[in-house]
Every structure is written in C-alpha cells, then in structure tokens.
C-alpha cells in the first residue's frame, strides 16, 4: 500500500479507482472552500471578505465550477465508481486497456495544477465556467490566465475521452460468460450511456476552446464581429457540450441509486427495461436541447419553440426513472440504512430540481429568469443534491467492499441529516432570490435581498460541518471498522444474488477473479 511506484504505475482497476476517489475528495474540498468564500462574500450586502475585489469574486466562481464538475463529480462518479465497480459487476478480470486507464487518471493532476496556476497569473480567469467571449477575449482578460484554464480543460477532456473509450470497450467485450447486457445491473448500463455522450461532445468543446485560444493568441476572429466572427457561435459549440455534460454525472448516479433502492427494498428494480431505455433516451435527448441556455441571445421564435418543447420532453424519461424507484420501494421491506437515506434524499431532491427546471424551460419565462439565482438553485438541486448525494450513497454502500470494514452507521446517519439540512437551507432560498430578480455572478446586491442571502450563507456553513462529518466516517472506517467476512456481508438480502460484487471477498483480491465466473442463474432482469 505504501509503495509510491505501485500507485504511480498501477494498471489495476481498483488502485486507479481509489486514486480517482482520493483526487475527487481533494478537489471536492477545494471546490467547497471556494463556495464557502462566495457565500461569505454574499452573506451581507456591500463588500465583505474580498474587500471590493470583484474580479477575485469571479475567479472564485469560475474555480468553484471547474473544480466541482471536472475534478470532483466526474472523476469520482465515472473514474472512481466506474473503475471499482464495473469490472467486478460484469465478471471481468480488469479494464480492457489497463495502461490507458492509468494515463486517464494521471492527466488529471496536471490539469488541476494548470487551473490552479491560472488563478495566480495576473488577475486570474474570471470568466465563469462557460468562458464566453468577449469576456474571455484578449481585451477583457489579457495575460495567460484564460489560456492556462483552456489548457487545463483540454487535458481534462483528453482524460475523459480515453476513459470513455476504455469503459465502452470493457463493457462491450469483457463481460463474463453468461453475463448478457440484460443481466447487467443498471449501474453497468449507465456507464456506456454516459461514455457515449462524453465521446461525442468533448471534441466539440475542444474545437470551441481551441478557436478561443487562436482568437486570443493568433489574431483570428472566430468570436469577433469586427473580423466577421460571431460570439454566439462559441455559445452554440460550448452548450452542445455543456448540456450533455450536466447529464453525464447524473446517469451513473441514477445507476447507483437503482442498485441501492433495489437492495434495501428487498426487490428487483421495477421496470428494468424501462429504466434502461429511459437512460438511453436521456443520453440522446441531452444533445437536442442545448439552446435552452441561450433563449436570451436573439434566437428566432420557431427555434425557441422547438427547444422549449424538446427540453420538456426530457422530463418524461426522468419521470419514468423516479416513478420506477418509487415503485421498487412500494410494498418492499425497506431498511433505512445510510445508503438508503441518501438514495431517498436523492430521489426527493432530484425531483425538486427537475420540477424547478420545467419553469425556465419555457422560453418566455426564461427571459425573466435567465442568469438569476433561480437557475443557480435549479442546477445545484440537480448536481449538488443529485450527483453528490448519489456519490455519498454509493460510498456508504460499497465502502465495506473497498476497505473490507463496516462504516459507523450512526455517524453515517448524522452525516446525512446535517448535509441534507445544510444543502436545503443553502439552496432553497435561492429560488426566491431568483424570482425577485437577483442576478448571478454579482458580488454585491441591494439590501432587499439581504434576508434570503443570510439564510443561504448560514446553510452553507452547516453543509461544511456535514462534509467534515463525512471525512470522520471515512477515517474511522478505514482505520477501525469491523472486518467483513463472507458470512458477514453488510447487505445480506436476497436481492444481492443478482450482482457479483458480494460474491467475492472484501476487499477483493488484487486480481479479483482467479477464473472468470460463469453466470448461470436464470433470474435475469429480462426473461
């Protein structure tokens, strides 16, 4: 365990998954620190801790978004959970391309360092995560900060593309004998449905930010109307990537939630095939709705009508998933252990996030709500309470498999309730701020907004206490939890017979399967 060479050159999927988790935890703590600094600045009207440095405020906003999306949620959800679980769940000895797996991870730390360094160059990169021109152009952001951030995005994108190729190949070609796709758990389905959109959308982002790079450094005018360019072109290219990107962390999360709800309800997932097709539909529809982020840029009325309708259609497969989870729990013998609490919390909060998303999907209403705190509240309910709660649920569910020890149940539940209360107190008041017209990315505001902002900032401090409790749980589990034996499987219910991970020892051997398991049982999800 302590040999650095083993970790640096490892081609073992479990080692690399662990590295992804550690990296995601570090980036998550840093991103949380940025968000708390933002909330401290917004706790009261007027200039607070940043002393009137509004560029620094925008640098914090940008860093918070990049850290949380590209360096926390995606590495932990796809790299961590995917690497650890997918080969075991499909009965594969390892990933298809182990050395590619290694470089996929090791591209991320330099990418993170590039992003950090961008904040230290001149005035930093204060563009927001969208990096829209002309704000990101050479006249508004001279110096190397934005170039450094763009290079960071390129590295992160290459990492994701290589990882996606690896997962698609592994799941296509390396399933154990008898493990058909229709026998695979929903988490296994969610990974290729996530990898395809990544593979298709990341090159578009790469093209967009490369155009931006040449505009800044080589005097091209892709985004400058003076030379025949158009800043709206960049918005279309970025959002073509950016919208699938926000579904990408949610899909593996929904696979994890399906796994957990099924186990703790003691029943197979309700409507397995419907769940699969719903995931595929979300993956496809995610590419057809990007301009709903652009209702205010002057699109013609027919275009806005189409994107309004297409955005609302995404609610259908999402609703199928939510009702299937509820139907799975209906009449089940439910055990409210920590993973199940996070799963139920996910379903409740993800539903709220989905409902609040239907409102700005209307292009007419979005004229009023665009770039207000209503939008911030909506996507944080989906991401901060969707993806992150799914990660916490999956961690508590599989931590016994990873460490070979049980986590402290009471501390896990305390972690859930503090976090649940904190994030709701932080984000729910933002709906009211947005409906009142408070714009995003602004470090100061009129006194009328002071009450809800104070409440929101207080909630963010509570969330930090909850996250600290999470690291206490991790420390106790890794150092002094009870050992798990074959006879002491933490979730010993009949439903586990449909997945392979509890049939191997905890923690699994360095090479999980001495010989490939033959899947012979007839209780496949689809007859």
Swiss-Prot record:
O2 binds at residue 247. Its EC number is 7.1.1.9. Its main location: mitochondrion. Keywords: Calcium, Copper, Electron transport, Heme, Iron, Magnesium, Membrane, Metal-binding, Mitochondrion, Mitochondrion inner membrane, Respiratory chain, Translocase, Transmembrane, Transmembrane helix, Transport. GO terms for biological process: electron transport coupled proton transport; mitochondrial electron transport, cytochrome c to oxygen. Cu cation binds at residues 243, 292-293. Gene3D superfamilies: Cytochrome c oxidase-like, subunit I domain. One of its GO terms (cellular component) is respiratory chain complex IV. Pfam families: COX1. This is Cytochrome c oxidase subunit 1. It comes from Pisum sativum.
